[in-house]
Amino acid sequence: MEGSSSSMQSKYKGVRKRKWGKWVSEIRLPNSRERIWLGSYDTPEKAARAFDAALYCLRGNNAKFNFPDNPPVISGGRNLSRSEIREAAARFANSAEDDSSGGAGYEIRQESASTSMDVDSEFLSMLPTVGSGNFASEFGLFPGFDDFSDEYSGDRFREQLSPTQDYYQLGEETYADGSMFLWNF
């Protein structure tokens, strides 16, 4: 039985078995020592499918896949970031249960991609339009924030805080400039 487990480990590229029985997948970036962690899966086939999806994103459709009869089809695959590659790999690996042919997995990916676009546009529409129209005078959630901007801006503010005053007055005592120290006993 142990012999079959070791043969399963070497059966798929980019897949290995953990001590506790989970199958994990990771892929090395081209011309780099860095790797992208693709996740842990219940079966070696799911982990291998995740590897295939990441391989497609990094190398294109001419790469040597674990399942050459069922290659992944990921729109915009060559232009994805690491986190997007990780997400596409997980999606492709978990779509294996639903599709016996390659087409159903593609439809699932397209659905979830369009759903995420809807959520993003919905989220963006909920944000306040800070600064639209009158730029700095409108602060959305912080009304009145800009009420004092005229009093403390420009030359008038610089004159009020001018370092040219030659004395500082504390209570009844007046100190000449520079003679007051913190530890002067």
From Swiss-Prot:
Q: Which InterPro entries match?
A: AP2/ERF_dom (IPR001471), AP2/ERF_dom_sf (IPR036955), AP2/ERF_TF_ERF_subfamily (IPR051032), DNA-bd_dom_sf (IPR016177)
A Gene Ontology biological process in which this protein takes part is: ethylene-activated signaling pathway
Q: One of this protein's Pfam families, by short name? A: AP2
Q: Name one GO molecular function term.
A: DNA-binding transcription factor activity
DNA-binding region ranges: 11-68
Q: Is Cell membrane among the key words of this record? A: no
Instruction: State the source organism's domain of life.
Output: Eukaryota
Q: Does the keyword DNA-binding apply?
A: yes
Q: Which UniProt keywords apply?
A: Activator, DNA-binding, Ethylene signaling pathway, Nucleus, Transcription, Transcription regulation
Gene Ontology cellular-component annotations: nucleus
Where does it reside?
Nucleus
Protein purpose: Probably acts as a transcriptional activator. Binds to the GCC-box pathogenesis-related promoter element. May be involved in the regulation of gene expression by stress factors and by components of stress signal transduction pathways.
Q: Which family does it belong to?
A: Belongs to the AP2/ERF transcription factor family. ERF subfamily.
**PANTHER family in the record:** ETHYLENE-RESPONSIVE TRANSCRIPTION FACTOR ERF017 (PTHR31985:SF273), ETHYLENE-RESPONSIVE TRANSCRIPTION FACTOR ERF042-RELATED (PTHR31985)
**Protein name, as recorded:** Ethylene-responsive transcription factor ERF017
User: Which organism does this record belong to?
Assistant: Arabidopsis thaliana
